[in-house]
């Protein structure tokens, strides 16, 4: 058997319409909330029986914006500055022979949504809005937790930035999204090789275009404006 067709069982609804700004790993911004919405064929509550007994879930999904026909045996992890090459299987790079991702998220709730059926509300996901999910498995602590594990070139989440907002800007961010946005920015969404303090970066988040600068270890949000015809991931209502 040389191949196998994976079926999309669900898609995520998140606050990230583009790749820029998505946390580099799941769980590092616990304030981020997303919805897992099942495809019509899999909207069967029996498939979720017992899932409420687990606190965390493992998602297997596709790097849908990074699918390529070819692949390279080595990649350049941003964590190492973008110059050092490592074997693709020694990294979590999206540029893989099979563009599959694995994320552990916290299960916040199981809800009924009109027109969507039963959905899963989760925290800490590192997925772009609309990302296809191929499988969901419960996280089992006794088997999946390894306190003695070593993290190679990424032993921790890295240095965090201090986030400041220009006068009046934070109030433009919906109150329920402020902590999540601050967490995203504190983890420095910039490409690792860009350190120009005069550069203005723009991040699309929760229906807003958020512009910021970084000087040293301080990130300053200079504006947060609503985007035209944009959508917020958890309800898809125009803002």
Feature-to-residue mapping (PLM):
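Mixed-charge, low-complexity intrinsically disordered regions
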Residues: 1-100, 112-121, 125-239
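Conserved positions in beta-strands of structured domains
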Residues: 13, 105-108
């Amino acid at each position: 058997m040389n191949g196998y067709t994976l079926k999309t069982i669900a898609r995520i609804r998140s606050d990230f319409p583009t790749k820029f700004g998505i946390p580099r790993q799941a769980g590092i911004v616990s304030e981020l909330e997303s919805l897992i919405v099942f495809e019509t064929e899999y909207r069967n509550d029996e498939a979720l029986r017992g899932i409420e007994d687990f606190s965390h879930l493992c998602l297997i999904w596709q790097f849908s914006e990074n699918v390529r026909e070819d692949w390279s045996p080595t990649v350049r992890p941003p964590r190492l500055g973008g110059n050092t090459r490592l074997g693709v299987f020694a990294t979590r790079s999206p540029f893989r022979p099979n563009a599959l991702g694995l994320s552990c998220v916290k299960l916040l709730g199981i809800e009924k949504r009109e027109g969507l059926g039963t959905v899963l509300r989760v925290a800490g996901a590192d997925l772009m809005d609309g990302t296809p999910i191929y499988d969901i498995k419960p996280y089992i602590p006794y088997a999946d937790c390894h306190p003695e594990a070593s993290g190679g070139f990424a032993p921790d989440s890295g240095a965090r930035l201090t986030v400041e907002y220009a006068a009046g800007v934070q109030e433009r961010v919906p109150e329920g999204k402020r902590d999540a946005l601050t967490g995203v920015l504190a983890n420095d969404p910039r490409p690792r090789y860009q350190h120009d303090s005069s550069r203005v970066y723009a991040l699309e988040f929760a229906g807003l275009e958020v512009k910021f600068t970084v000087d040293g270890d301080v990130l300053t949000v200079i504006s947060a404006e609503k985007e035209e015809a944009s959508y917020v991931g958890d309800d898809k209502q125009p803002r």
